[in-house]
Swiss-Prot record:
Keywords: Chaperone. The gene is hscB. One of its GO terms (cellular component) is iron-sulfur cluster transfer complex. GO terms for molecular function: ATPase activator activity; protein-folding chaperone binding. The keyword Chaperone applies. It comes from Pseudomonas putida (strain ATCC 47054 / DSM 6125 / CFBP 8728 / NCIMB 11950 / KT2440). GO terms for biological process: [2Fe-2S] cluster assembly; protein complex oligomerization; protein folding. InterPro entries: DnaJ_domain, HscB, HscB_C_sf, HscB_oligo_C, J_dom_sf. Interacts with HscA and stimulates its ATPase activity. This is Co-chaperone protein HscB homolog. Residues 5-77 form the J domain.
Length: 173
């Protein structure tokens, strides 16, 4: 049994631009249908299949709702598999990374919750710009190398956003 395309599970065409609210609604509908508890009285085989379907659905949803994971997945299903551990070779972006990290470290040292909020807004704007850039080059034939570079940047910003949320939680306690 092959793994169905994540998009096909949700009756969607592969695209970077998604309506995340509709995706979440469809996920909840499908999750109710395949939830393992619904198969408590079924045969062991049917229970296992329900569990596998539920796990596949959860994985597909987590992938599609995350812009960097969705970008990586699109590249993979288009035959442009991206190794997990390749670094970004863009000096300007590397410098920007260092500046963001230093700024975040200063905000942590100063326990500046308001500053973290401002940083978070700037980071979100940078993520939105990257997402739009990726969507634009994804729609343009022959731009897969650029799409890969943008996806790597998206992954970095996503990781940085997670660190910002964690810092925000620590400072908010």
């Amino acid at each position: 049994m092959g793994t169905p395309c994540h998009y096909a599970l949700f009756d969607l065409q592969p695209s970077f631009r998604l309506d995340l609210d509709k995706l979440a609604t469809r996920y909840r509908e499908l999750a109710r249908e395949v939830h393992p508890d619904r198969f408590a009285d079924a045969s062991e085989r049917e229970q296992r299949i329900a569990l596998e379907k539920s796990a596949a659905l959860n994985d597909a949803y987590q992938t599609l709702r995350s812009a960097p994971r969705r970008a990586r997945y699109l590249l993979a299903i288009s035959g442009h598999e991206v190794p997990q551990e390749v670094t970004v070779h863009d000096p300007d972006f590397l410098l920007q990374q260092m500046q963001w990290r230093e700024e975040l470290e200063e905000l942590q040292d100063e326990a500046d919750l308001d500053g973290v909020g401002v940083f978070k807004k700037r980071l979100k704007a940078a993520q939105d710009t990257l997402n739009e850039d990726f969507a634009g080059c994804w729609d343009a034939p022959g731009e897969r190398d650029k799409a890969e570079r943008l996806m790597r940047r998206m992954q970095f910003l996503d990781k940085l956003a997670q660190e910002v949320r964690q810092l925000e939680e620590r400072l908010d306690d």
